[in-house]
Amino acid sequence: DPLLPWRRARRAYGVFLEVMAEAARAFGAYLLAGSLLSPPYEEELARGRFSRTPFFQNLALFFNPKGRLLAQVPKMELTPPERWLRRGRFGPHLVETEAGKVGILICLDGFYERHLARLDALGAEILLQPSANPAPWERPWPPDPARKEGEVWVASAQARLLGREHLRLLLNPMLNGEVAGLGFQGRSGIYAPGEALRLAQAPTGDEALLLRL
């Protein structure tokens, strides 16, 4: 069936949407569910759920505490294994909520200064950067083997908010475990300008990071 990938994607999107909306309602919290490889879908009264494009993207879905989908955010900068995906365009990456203005950049997007500067100039106060790094946390960092991967990651996150007009808080949840034959490691963190406020104790395994502001 040549259309099987799209049929599966539509079903997976529906399940993902329903489960994450339910989780947001259950916890009464804003929830960023990232990420999902799928065409972006819309809903309209007569047509139901549909997509305007057949192209797959790397998408993060952002929900409010009532389980309402606020934004469907596409990744803009793609890694070599993602080159079969369609690059997203800037747009839904800034969301104004009752808790403040939230910027969303998926993994690699958050390392590009032009995306950070744009969100900061638009007034984003909180940056959400869901990440998946398929590399050992303690390996030598390829551009500078004298430093370790994790060391560079944390230092970069601490520096990312320095000197900004509005950005004050960075939440960087990191995928751990085996997915599609790849091993992912990373210490999730909550950062302020120049410092890590909370860091997961290890680059593998599950851990909840809580911060009272």
Which residues does each PLM region occupy?
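Glycine-/acidic-rich phosphate or pyrophosphate-binding loops and their flanking alpha/beta elements
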Residues: 86-99
